[in-house]
Design a protein with these regions (language model features):
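Short C-terminal boundary/hinge segments that cap the last helix of small helical domains
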Residues: 56-71, 300
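Conserved hydrophobic/aromatic packing and binding residues within compact polymer-binding modules
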Residues: 9, 20-24, 32-37, 62
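Conserved binding/catalytic microenvironments
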Residues: 104-413
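Recognition helix of helix-turn-helix/homeodomain-like DNA-binding domains
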Residues: 28-43, 66
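A short, Lys/Arg-rich alpha-helix, primarily the initiator
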Residues: 1-15
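DNA major-groove recognition helix of helix-turn-helix/homeodomain DNA-binding modules
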Residues: 28, 46-61
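Short, charged recognition helix plus adjacent turn
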Residues: 65-94
């Protein structure tokens, strides 16, 4: 943790009139954790959120600018090689004249649209390597199509390229290549606006807000999502399912940012708006690229339960996870949410179990996710936090499943 952030924790503690012991008690954290935070040691975002809540400030208030830590290592070097072709297609070298790279041949628009759908299906199927191999060709051929066509056909080509960029941004955000993802998403939003496709641009904003959340840019994510949601607010009686879905997704982003930033009133109102959109939709919908990801009554409820996890109400997480809208009967009625949304929810359940000392129940959740979404799981910090807690707190000998999962997630005992 940066010295500036440590200074901020100390400053706001003193402003609140609390000793270190008093802050530890107010936040329900150990005294050693508070001391670690004020000494510049590494603490999780969950801990920072807990400290901010106890201090009565937004989480982002505690942040401070400092030099980043080195990320050099074998994995960083490997990732640069793995993404070299995609980087060239997305971010070509540019000089005083034309780009150095050849965009290739213009693809048929129907083939481009089909390629995006096939790539997205691979993304949902946890086939990240296959997605990475497919994206460079989609980006080059869609760029060439925009350059080669004119008039109405060019506008259709711009929309097809926007779809390819949205898929690229989604994939790169998932695998935590944030700067590349930002480039793809901002370019998609720009193209959609240029083509007068407000709903498509809003889909890009949903993706960009997800990226901002992953970068802990809570204020910006909340403000951008709320502003866009107000600009595209639908008439419920006339709105298409895709319009309702993207509007609801924007409110989900507002809520996610606000709850992480210790703004519970804003989060509650945003959840209410998302629930209204989900109720009007009355089913789960995942029609990318007409909207970003899955949305519907089940997804809206999953995200409300996520709020409970973020504020440490683990018993309520477990109580609501198989009740009401999340019961088996309701899920069958409304439709199953997307694999990433469902997986994130089950990680919240695993986290609740391990917090309450139910190691085997937590492992059951992790093992099921490994069977269904093993590659996705390796990109989830929450999975590593849960596994690390199991290794740290379990008093008995680790099971074979525990050792195997720790190796899969790269968590040392």
């Amino acid at each position: 943790m940066s010295t500036g952030l440590a200074d901020n924790v100390r400053k706001y503690r003193r402003t609140a009139g609390l000793s270190q012991e008093g802050l530890a008690e107010a936040a329900d954290l150990s005294l050693s954790t508070v001391r670690k935070a004020e000494q510049g040691g590494h603490v999780s975002m969950e801990t920072l959120h807990t400290l901010a809540r106890a201090l009565g400030v937004s989480t982002s208030t505690l942040f401070a600018t400092d030099a980043p830590k080195s990320v050099l290592g074998k994995r960083d070097e490997a990732n640069r090689r793995y993404l070299a072709e995609l980087r060239r297609a997305l971010m070509p070298a540019v000089g005083l004249s034309a780009p150095l790279s050849d965009p290739g041949e213009a693809g048929e628009l129907s083939e481009l649209r089909r390629g995006v759908q096939e790539g997205h299906a691979l993304y949902w199927a946890d086939q990240y390597g296959a997605v990475a191999k497919r994206l460079p060709g989609l980006l080059r051929s869609s760029e060439a199509a925009v350059s080669a066509l004119e008039g109405e056909e060019q506008e259709h080509a711009m929309i097809a390229r926007c779809h390819a960029l949205l898929l690229t941004g989604k994939y790169l955000t998932q695998v935590r290549q944030y700067d590349m993802a930002y480039f793809a998403l901002v370019e998609a939003i720009r193209l959609a606006r240029e083509a007068h496709q407000a709903q498509l641009a809003s889909t890009g904003v949903v993706g960009l807000c997800w990226l901002l959340l992953r970068q802990d840019r809570f204020d910006e994510a909340e403000q951008l999502a709320a502003q866009t949601a107000r600009e595209i607010e639908p008439r419920m009686s006339e709105a298409t399912p895709a319009h309702l879905a993207v509007w609801g997704e924007l409110w989900l982003r507002v809520a996610s940012a606000a709850v992480r930033n210790n703004r519970p009133e804003v989060a509650r109102e945003a959840r209410r708006m998302a629930a209204a959109a989900a109720s009007a939709l009355n089913t789960e919908d995942e029609s990318f690229p007409h909207h970003w990801g899955g949305f519907g009554p089940v997804t809206a409820e999953l995200k409300a339960v996520e709020d409970l996890s973020l504020v440490g109400d683990t018993r309520s997480v477990l109580r609501r996870t198989d009740d009401g809208i999340l019961s088996d009967k309701s899920v069958r009625n409304f439709g199953r949410p997307t694999a990433p949304n469902w997986g994130r929810h089950r990680l919240d359940v695993a986290h609740a179990h391990v917090t309450l000392g139910s190691h085997q129940d937590a492992m059951d959740e992790l093992m099921q996710l490994r069977r269904t979404s093993g590659e996705w799981l390796t990109h989830q910090p929450m999975a590593r936090y849960v596994m690390a807690d199991i290794l740290k707190t379990r008093k008995r000998t680790l099971t074979e499943d525990m050792r195997s999962m720790a190796a899969h997630l790269g968590v040392a005992g």
